[in-house]
Design a protein with these regions (language model features):
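Hydrophobic alpha-helical bundle cores within soluble ligand-binding/oligomerization subdomains
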Residues: 2-6, 10-413
Length: 413
């Protein structure tokens, strides 16, 4: 006689109505801590740690952030962008020999392949936001190079693709901008460093050393900054095993959102609207009365001053000019107005406020503010892509269903 196997009924999860408490949990009765038991995170994943990283950290309560243990602000003051790029990829700062070898490695990677260059005019003509043509061009570039899924590559091959994406980004951004203006692209100069090359390719004239240095400090200060939206997007895509180009394209898409990458030009627009110090109260109180955000103030991580803003304020002072003086007046008065209205929050300038001033003083057009940010942040994206691929587990969270109860009978007609 055949013995029947006893089947234990599946325990159904208990789903309570969506609570007002964002940290409320979804539990499975009788299976405490069982694999797959959901943990409900707050909206936006604020404060949620999803992985370990050795790339850097943001300590908001201290007003401090670093790249691989070195203060990012100190790096911006003392090291060129290429050294910081090397640091994020290799894990240590280069010595003189490593610096020369790295420069020799990345210099030829700045040139746009002929098959990609041939299509850039059409991409530029297609229009869209400043990052839209770049997103398309990066996708084309990755296909042109034959980038394969990260899961199929060894570490050296992944590094090769990541280097290529970082090196080509400033060239593509400036070429697309110039083509959109009806101008010919300017090839990178092998004798110029990254920041100088960026301004050279943007304008077609040799940049003033002071401008190149100011832009370099900005670029170094924005290479990486924790698990922001675009970096997290890049890691999610990398976790699927997709190619590095696909991960960067996704990150660009995230950066194109105004809540992430669109504030530098908007902060500068505020300065233009104010015009003179005597109009600060009138303009700002109007925006506050309308319930609008004052662009360039406040940060989701920093509870006081953004260290990047502090550094860029000094860079702006070094550049000088009436606009810088106005910015300092606006910074001081807006902080007072915000303190009066929101005494429980210490809203101070974030990186975007003085970033716009610095870039404008260095001749970077406003439509290129966010692309300029992308030209350095791509290094952080790629460092995170490499780190994700080195110890990968696909990022696959869950969602809580809050629609009508299921299953429902399918109606017939």
């Amino acid at each position: 006689m055949k013995t029947q196997r006893r089947v234990t009924p599946r325990t159904k999860p208990t789903i309570s109505p969506l609570p007002s408490d964002p940290l409320a949990t979804l539990t499975t009765p009788g299976i405490p801590g069982a694999p797959g038991t959901p943990l409900v995170a707050p909206r936006g994943l604020k404060g949620v740690i999803v992985t370990d990283t050795a790339i850097g950290d943001v300590r908001g309560s201290e007003g401090f952030y670093h790249y691989r243990q070195y203060s990012a602000v100190e790096l911006a003051e003392k090291r060129p962008l290429e050294d910081v790029w090397f640091l994020l990829f290799e894990g240590h700062l280069p010595d003189e020999a490593e610096r020369r070898a790295f420069a020799a490695e990345i210099t030829p990677l700045r040139m746009v392949p002929d098959d990609v260059a041939a299509v850039l005019p059409a991409i530029a003509r297609a229009g869209g936001g400043p990052l839209d043509p770049f997103r398309t061009a990066i996708s084309l570039f990755a296909a042109s190079r034959g980038m394969r899924p990260l899961i199929d590559l060894n570490p050296a091959e992944r590094r090769r693709d990541a280097l290529a994406l970082c090196a080509i980004t400033p060239t593509l951004l400036t070429a697309l901008h110039r083509l959109g203006l009806g101008l010919e692209p300017v090839d990178p100069d092998p004798d110029l460093a990254a920041a100088s090359n960026y301004l050279w390719m943007l304008h077609g004239i040799r940049p003033y050393p002071a401008h190149a240095r100011a832009i370099e400090q900005y670029l170094v200060s924005t290479v990486d900054h924790g698990f922001n939206a675009s970096t997290f997007t890049a890691r999610v895509i990398a976790s699927t095993g997709a190619d590095a180009g696909a991960a960067v394209v996704g990150a660009i898409g995230a950066l194109s959102g105004p809540l992430h990458g669109g504030a530098p030009s908007r902060a500068l627009d505020l300065l233009d609207e104010i015009g003179t110090p005597d109009r600060i109260d009138e303009v700002v109180t109007h925006h506050l009365a309308e319930g609008e955000v004052i662009m360039g103030f406040g940060h989701p991580v920093y509870q006081g001053e953004d260290p990047r803003s502090v550094m860029l304020r000094d860079v702006a002072r070094r550049l000088g000019g009436e606009q810088v003086a106005l910015a300092e007046h606006v910074e001081a008065r807006v902080a007072q107005l915000l303190d009066e209205r929101k005494p429980d929050r210490r809203l101070r300038t974030n990186v975007e406020f003085y970033a716009g001033v610095v870039m404008d003083r260095c001749g970077v057009p406003r439509e290129m503010f966010t692309p300029t940010f992308a030209s350095s942040r791509v290094i952080g994206w790629c460092a995170n892509i490499l780190e994700q691929a080195a110890a990968n587990k696909i990022i696959r969270p869950s969602a809580r269903y809050v629609g009508p109860p299921a299953p429902a009978p399918v109606p017939t007609i």
